[in-house]
């Protein structure tokens, strides 16, 4: 076998007949497969042992030679070589065809490669190949043109006139002769001359032909090899025949297809030997051609060949295509051994880095390890004995298992794996039962819940894999979300509620105002029931020993609550005492107003002080998230994970103690709800009257009514939230962020509001009842539309979002951080992203974690805040914005000069770790996952504003697809192609509006539809590429008008707009990586003296290389314009044919690659996965794998101290 790791590249080409014969181990002459009585392969048949090797290891067919000692012998009786049966997976055979046959890929593909080369139409080719017409190969004295088609009758006429003086042939033979006569160099010269003079369609055709001729010339493929004289037969184990229980046989479809070819070929040979009449031979040749077509690509031409039950047979091409094809089923997605799956249950007592494995599963997964250990400890005598002990589950097995799994991490995965946090490593602990136990905090990353979800377990076997799992994938390491750098392990549900309840304060709590010496006293008093969790008390500040308290403060009493004292025990000591949920308190110090000077208290002591003070808000989910982020910023990952565990335990403990329940009585209907409804009802009546009088249109009436009822709902919601008791359980759940929100509550206690019809249009009749009061039949019926649409949408959305992620990953999979600094001289100018007055993404968020491209000085003090190529930390970012600076140049993936992938400086901080990104990080895949994963949270719907035509704005997922596929958007905006002033806006014919822009040299007028809103005024100056009407810009057009940089920024802004409006935060750099991949090609306009072809798409780097070469030799350079490709198109245009073929349109990609003789340098991840190499990212990168080991005494201890996760 070939060693995969010695591969450097992979090349594909056409096979010459000699090459096919050299692969073959013998010719298959008979269509037989196996003998029905002996079940042995037939000699010279499709499974022949003489050709393909023995079916049993080290045993010839007749049984004369058995055992390994005869290795390499060829049996003199049956001619079978004694060797391993595995060779039946690699040895090929062949069929010598009695007549040449065309290869359907090259004749039928679009464009037809054969047609372009011969300059014949695909129709003409088809007529010749399938024996409907003759083609003139050598005209002789007839005056016919070469390649002319002749019908049967015309051929006879000419034949009678010029017997034996000219040559015209039918079938693939004629085409083969023509292909053999082609002189590629001559053809190339002619085509290059034609390029100079041709225009329009002729030019396009010439360019296409030139491309094919160049391909053949450069690749060393001969055109005649597109016609087959010899047909290869793939090894038999790849098209197996297996016996089923009933004694019947199941066989691969390929065997049927091969059988048809062999039968027809043998019949043709016989007919030729007998000298049969031409028409019979012709018919047989045509049938042979069709049989070979069906074998290569069944169904490409005509009706597909069907098997039993009218099912089309799967040909060689189908074996590669689609989700079930060789690429996606076996090469990119393999099933793995040492894996198990089971239902998950919550494991509240686990540490952050642990998971619970069911005993039986663990035993099965770690079987070989346990067996080895049993034998080593001499508990079992040999491996066989150890195996039986394990199968009987003897008692001594369990102790060994405990030992074996200690410090051996396992990987847990939940499908669908939408981002890299869908697979994490844990240290297993054995649990009873058959459910996998999962730590409650990692559920958010997996998007898992415990209603019956299942998860898969995988065991990393090698030492390297274990080390990677422990160092990089341990759940305690994955605290930040790669998409925005925020903690992903925030507490949820019970944990939030428990911590919220713990930090709540109540006015009526027992013994308010009591003063204690230290925290221990407080806890004792709480345990004895003297104070309640919600009691506000005073404690001597000095007893906290908090480093952030000033001397002054230490002399005073800290006013806080019992619960907050308990909560602060889980926070690291160097933090300020957290007494209120504000950033100030969290990042800097406890506000001074909570320190009370005991001498200033009046008669009533602290109690009186508290009675005049407002209650402090309890800590909700968002604030807990901020605490985690702050701890992460200041401490190591280990400390953070310990703090998280303590927060989780606290939350569970106190949500249990709180005993929060929900009853019908907790839903209090608003008393003056009816009054609000009546007021709005009157407003609706007024609108209806106006409509009846003809003062307003139907659309205006509808929009006004919808607005009135929306306002009514908002008013009820506002008043409801005001009137609620702060200790109402439902309010507590929604306020803490544990479950539900204000809108849910309004539906329960206020009114349900307006509903959407199945069309997406809003029904103007509102549901005025709430669930508490109950809905009328009509109201209930109206509300079912929305519910059903919601479910249908979710199902569609999941599939759409998954497909989007797949396309994104495919286009960006080869973007890896490949160098430290690319040395670019360009940068990206960033500022706030705004839509009108609404802030979409603030400037500070855009610069944090990036490298600066310029020196920034404070505008007042002139002090240097940051120099070029320095990282902008959160502190520096705050300094920059505080100085009043609103825009700056930063390093960006858009302007990175790295040839493959990006460089560290242009990418910036790695959001998953908060450190600078390292060479080898697969940032393309991370970017794709970060954009694709929130896709399921985006809405599907296009907002219908009451059926007003033209103003439907696409939003949510469809809009994201529209942007990344670079499609023409719905509701397209008109942009100006010149800089100037808006001279006039007038009505044109067909109810259109005309906008006239006057520039310095020319005046242009633009037409907009009558319904679109114009957003410029007469006399307003406009820049090139500026929007004149409301809507989305068509990006391809914008690229040619406004240029590359403006287009990149526009696409970035549009993507951010969609996600931010849905409340999803994604870092700019991910979008930048994707957009850069869409703009990495240029289209050649003029070739100059370079070898580039005009009209062809080339990689921007290849273009600059060609021009550099031209400048060196003082030749004319090529000119080109940037092209924006949608992600699907960009994936198919990638340099790597393996990656493109495994994505979509497999046959087209391979046909093209074979003719060009493409080589794949295996730079991306996908290509390497396909051939089974380590991926060239992370630890698989060359620079990390070619490491020299030095043995020293020191590192072992260091490594151990790092891997110990403190309890």
From Swiss-Prot:
Listed GO biological process terms: DNA-templated transcription
Protein known as: DNA-directed RNA polymerase subunit beta'
Family in the record: Belongs to the RNA polymerase beta' chain family.
Cofactor annotation comment: Binds 1 Mg(2+) ion per subunit. Binds 2 Zn(2+) ions per subunit.
Binding site for Mg(2+): 449, 451, 453
Family matches, as CDD domains: RNAP_beta'_C, RNAP_beta'_N
Cofactor: Mg(2+); Zn(2+)
Annotated residues for binding of Zn(2+) 1: 60, 62, 75, 78
Catalysed conversion reaction: RNA(n) + a ribonucleoside 5'-triphosphate = RNA(n+1) + diphosphate
Its job: DNA-dependent RNA polymerase catalyzes the transcription of DNA into RNA using the four ribonucleoside triphosphates as substrates.
InterPro entries per record: DNA-dir_RpoC_beta_prime (IPR045867), DNA-dir_RpoC_beta_prime_bact (IPR012754), RNA_pol_asu (IPR000722), RNA_pol_N (IPR006592), RNA_pol_Rpb1_1 (IPR007080), RNA_pol_Rpb1_3 (IPR007066), RNA_pol_Rpb1_3_sf (IPR042102), RNA_pol_Rpb1_4 (IPR007083)
Sorted UniProt keywords: DNA-directed RNA polymerase, Magnesium, Metal-binding, Nucleotidyltransferase, Transcription, Transferase, Zinc
Lineage of producing organism: Bacteria, Bacillati, Bacillota, Bacilli, Bacillales
Enzyme Commission number(s) of this protein: 2.7.7.6
GO MF term list: DNA binding; DNA-directed RNA polymerase activity; magnesium ion binding; zinc ion binding
Binding site for Zn(2+) 2: 822, 896, 903, 906
GO cellular component terms, A-Z: DNA-directed RNA polymerase complex
